[in-house]
């Protein structure tokens, strides 16, 4: 994703 998903 373009956003930080915590991975």
Swiss-Prot record:
Record bears the keyword Secreted: yes
Record bears the keyword Secreted: yes
Primary site of residence: secreted
Gene Ontology cellular component list: extracellular region
Alphabetized UniProt keyword annotations: Cell wall, Secreted
Protein name: 60 kDa cell wall protein
Localization annotation: Secreted, Cell wall
């Amino acid at each position: 994703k373009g956003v930080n998903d915590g991975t």
